[in-house]
Amino acid sequence: MGNEFRVCDDCQATNVKTLIPKLKKVDSCATIEVACQSYCGPGRKKSFAFVNNRPVAAPTEDELIVKIEAKLNK
């Protein structure tokens, strides 16, 4: 089973236009879903993504990608 990334296009700290290409570099075969994730509180202050149904958040997008790569053991 492949990896799944879920991101919100409505949260203030998440820039979907720049985050999705970075997620594709992490795993080009992963499924990426863009929709409200009901994670609004943390989403106002931190970049986040759900990775295989688990939330991963960081102060910046670059730090988020590092955390996601670590979670996927790349």
UniProtKB/Swiss-Prot annotation:
It comes from the Bacteria. Pfam families: DUF1450. Belongs to the UPF0741 family. This is UPF0741 protein BcerKBAB4_5177.
